[in-house]
Amino acid sequence: MDSRCFGFFFTLLSLNVIVLAYDPDTLQDLCVADRTSGIKVNGFTCKPESNITASDFFFAGIGKPAVVNNTVGSAVTGANVEKIAGLNTLGVSLARIDYAPGGLNPPHTHPRATEVIFVLEGELDVGFITTANKLFAKTVKKGEVFVFPRGLIHYQKNNDKAKPASVISAFNSQLPGTQSIAATLFTATPAIPDHVLTTTFQIGTKEIEKIKSKFAPKKV
């Protein structure tokens, strides 16, 4: 193949890969999610336009702080296609994260989206880790913005041990997905074999079981 033709082909292929790396583009003005449909597609099927209302594009759930009542000290309120049906095929979503004093949003990833946070209140230590195990960390304050690249492990921690904090997160996916590193490893169903975890973390079975017990549902 002529080198110029190969170069042109490679460029087209690269552009195609980039385009396919995010949520697919919409092919019509509206494709409001029909969450009752049993049909499985990459996203949701569209409800009939005659059934679409303004409410399909509205959500009031991130206007005020969430109640934080867990051991890590943070609560995430999603504003994605599961809450706003009109986001289907649009490739964007939001979330609000509220932190108790000293609260942490533990290390996690979003496999389908880059995240941008805007600090509403407080001061947070934030950071992400590259595949080369390099940490990029920063302290961000009210009115400031920080970016977490798609798929990389990241975290946020409220610096203030006396006051709460909150951020708004924006994603370039209607449903970015979240995998908490610790919970994923220690609460998977079926469970990851203990010998995998003991070898990975270089600790004994008793320590593994102790960690798992921390994530077990609390008995009422």
Swiss-Prot record:
SUPFAM superfamilies: RmlC-like cupins. One of its GO terms (molecular function) is manganese ion binding. Residues 58-209 form the Cupin type-1 domain. CDD domains: cupin_OxOx (cd02241). Its main location: secreted. Glycans are attached at residues 51, 69. Disulfide bonds join 31-46. Mn(2+) binds at residues 108, 110, 115, 154. PROSITE patterns: GERMIN (PS00725). Keywords: Apoplast, Disulfide bond, Glycoprotein, Manganese, Metal-binding, Secreted, Signal. GO terms for cellular component: apoplast; plant-type cell wall. It comes from the Eukaryota. Residues 1-21 form the signal peptide. Gene3D superfamilies: Jelly Rolls. Oligomer (believed to be a pentamer but probably hexamer). Belongs to the germin family. This is Germin-like protein subfamily 2 member 4.
